[in-house]
Amino acid sequence: MKKPVRAAIVGALGLAAAGASNAADVVRYPLLGGSTFPIARAVEVPAGKTIIFHSGTTPAPLDPKAEQGTAAYWGDTKTQALSTFARIKESLDTMKLDFGNVAAMTVYLVGDPAKGGRMDFEGFMAAYTQFFGTKEQPNLPARSTVQVAGLVAPGMLVEIEVQLVK
């Protein structure tokens, strides 16, 4: 008699835990001080969710016929960021995910020679805000953006790495 009761209790607790896990949602904490900058201060992933680590993605050449390593070949930071986001979207589509699943993002920007060697943060943000913090896709990731000395190809200015939750 004790075994059936114990099994029923364990089964009920398991179902309750599964229901709670499915009902739990990712929590995105806004920046403090009423900031409207389009990133999350933090993203909390509840138990039972799957975390996916997506490799860094770089842009496709803007003009493959141009001289490799030039701005004509790759484009500026905004152009490269738009291309990179398009390539990430293409990858996410094959995984049945979208930008709303992005919980964290690390952005690597090379200093743009046309900007005196400084990263073009404004150009990057012009691309980023087309995909995040929009009416259609309001979910904001926790994000870090850093300037790096270089990426895998001369003239490449953008690489983006994302972590996703489903």
What are these regions (language model features)?
Residues 4-86, 90-103, 112-166:
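N-terminal presequence-like segments and the immediate start of the first folded domain
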